[in-house]
Amino acid sequence: MVYTLTTPNGYGYVVLIALGGIPLLSNIQGNVVTFLRKPANVPYPNAYASHEQAKENQDAYKFNCAQRAHANLLENMPQTMATMLFAGLEYPTVTAALGLGWLLARSLYAFGYIKYNKRYSLGGGAFWLCQGGLWALSCATALKML
């Protein structure tokens, strides 16, 4: 069988952010974790420094913050990418804008967590608003298909 998928104008921006920008951010954060691992003295396969290590060694604490920020990104990536690709079929401009906002907020979240040890210190929690908006647009798209 042959299927034809017609995408709206601007859908390329949705794909560029969902399948380009988001994985790039994950790669960057993964590299930050790798860079911070050696000074923290956390050997593989340990994912985190122990509580005792982090308490005594600021580098270990910073490593844990970077690792947790990256893990949180990985936890939120799949649904964000999926909702973008689906919602963008009906609302490409708003979806691309929310996706870009999500990327920016996730970057601020990670930077604030690593640099200042506070997850929401730089407004990074705004990613939840963007993610909620993408979910709502996905639901609206699904309702239009009924």
Where are these regions (language model features)?
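Membrane-embedded alpha-helical transmembrane segments of multi-pass integral membrane proteins
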Residues: I22-L25, Q29, P78, G101-Y109, ...
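Core segments of transmembrane alpha-helices
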Residues: A71-M84, L134
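Short membrane-interface loop/juxtamembrane segments of multi-pass integral membrane proteins
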Residues: S50-L73
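Interfacial loop-to-transmembrane junctions
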Residues: L108-G133
